[in-house]
A protein has these predicted regions:
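Beta-strand-dominated extracellular/periplasmic modules and repeats
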Residues: 1-194
Length: 194
């Protein structure tokens, strides 16, 4: 008896459209995290999700969580004695397009205290859901050239030659940042086991 192997295929289909408001109509307002009165340095962050071969990952979903410009999360676990910026929404969720892209309008986050109360470098927490993943993957986006990166306690846990995979790079225009997120392969982004 000859057995035919099962075809290699990713899990799916991935129903991101049910979780990303406005996806079907092209409304990307779920990626606008900074309102008109939001304090801090406004940034436009373009995230591009790529597979092993450097091809765009379509039908993925990206979630961002971050502190406001003063380094305060709008979350009960943040016990700092400060009020979060009421005009800032520290969460955004978008689907990737046919180029693997999604664009968030936010602010550069402030430094937040770490486990030993040492200030962490400005960063954005990222969750990725995509075809072929059985569960989300989680990373951080840091900002290239920020002097707070070097002493950051989480960054120091990552081998030096892998840290670049977590860096957003400045764009041509002021306030624009780009981040390439590689799910697998030789340029794979560092992911955390959370």
């Amino acid at each position: 008896m000859d057995l035919i192997p099962t075809a290699n295929q990713p899990i799916g289909p991935f129903y991101h459209f049910a979780l990303t408001p406005g996806w079907a109509t092209g409304d990307n307002s779920a990626g606008v995290m900074a309102g008109p009165g939001t304090l801090g340095e406004r940034i436009r962050l373009t995230v591009r999700v790529l597979d092993r071969d450097g091809s765009p990952v379509t039908n993925g979903m990206i979630e961002l969580w971050q502190a406001d410009a003063a380094g305060k999360y709008d979350h009960p676990a943040d016990t700092q004695n400060r009020t979060p910026d009421p005009a800032f929404r520290g969460f955004g969720r978008l689907a990737t397009d046919d180029q693997g892209l999604c664009v968030f309008e936010t602010v550069k986050p402030g430094q937040v205290p770490g486990l030993r109360r040492q200030l962490q470098a400005p960063h954005i927490n990222v969750s990725v859901y995509a075809p072929g993943l059985l569960r989300r993957v989680v990373t951080r986006i840091y900002f290239e050239g920020d002097p707070a990166n070097e002493p950051d306690e989480i960054m120091r846990l990552v081998p030096e030659d892998r840290r670049a995979s977590m860096m957003a790079r400045p764009g041509v225009e002021s306030g624009q940042w780009g981040f390439e997120l590689h799910l697998t392969g030789p340029c794979e982004t560092v992911f955390f086991d959370v």
